[in-house]
Amino acid sequence: MRLAKYIGVMAKPQNDTTTAISMTAPVLMSRGAGDGADTPVGASEGSHSNPFSPEENAKTYKMAFFMPASRFSKASDAPKPTNPDVTIKDVPARTLAVHTFSGNLRQAAIAERGERLRRALEADGVAAKEGAEVMAAGYNPPWTPWFLKTNEVMLEVSGM
């Protein structure tokens, strides 16, 4: 909800200029708090129930989306969040391995597909970046029927 409030999905945007910002896809999810160095522009982190896994107990995760490049070419161009738990960051280019799948984006599916991606990389002789965490990406609004949803798991790779 923090990101939705920042961009003004349901009410007045919670940013220093009260500028409404278009929602973009994908929305990224990753487990674990950290310094956010790997988090795209428009990131929020904290301890919440994963919106993609409502049956889960509260977990710490990061949620992020990409700012529209047509309006904000760098993080400093974007309106400043009024909520200190929302951060805006530039993310350097990186190489990600991606596995696409359909269905609901649940923690069990993320874990299974992430492991499948790791095994495929290993079989192809591609190394995941040391300490890389699986990220989940959802491309559809919540009201999309489960069988029409497009999701991805992503893992940063090194040496490519």
Task: Give the predicted meaning of each segment.
Residues M1-M160:
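A solvent-exposed interaction/effector surface
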